[in-house]
Amino acid sequence: MAKSGYNASFLLLISMFLILLTFSNVVEGYNKLRPTDCKPRCTYRCSATSHKKPCMFFCQKCCATCLCVPKGVYGNKQSCPCYNNWKTQEGKPKCP
């Protein structure tokens, strides 16, 4: 009897883990762009800066790798973890 209770608990735990894993993949994929979406998103992202060329270069590079560009012209990087966590050798943010 104790063994069947253990098996049921184990199956419930595995099921909950798989459901959690599925939802985490759905949330992670929420910001996924197609590569063709990068240029228009970066054009808007870099629209408020006076350094448009470097902003566009790095934004498109980051978007090509991360397939995500944060909303707005500044900040909101927490919505794109890959974009947010990519740093230069000096430890500064690589993505605008």
From Swiss-Prot:
Cellular localization per UniProt: Secreted
Signal peptide bounds: 1-29
Record PTM text: Six disulfide bonds may be present.
Stimuli inducing this protein: By auxin.
Tissue specificity as recorded in UniProt: Expressed very early in lateral root development.
One GO CC annotation: extracellular region
Chief subcellular location: secreted
Transmembrane segments: none
Keyword terms of this UniProt record: Disulfide bond, Secreted, Signal
Taxonomic path: Eukaryota, Viridiplantae, Streptophyta, Embryophyta, Tracheophyta
Keyword Disulfide bond included in the entry's annotation: yes
Name of this protein: Protein RSI-1
The species this protein was found in: Solanum lycopersicum (Tomato)
Domain of life: Eukaryota
Nuclease as UniProt keyword: no
Sequence similarity: Belongs to the GASA family.
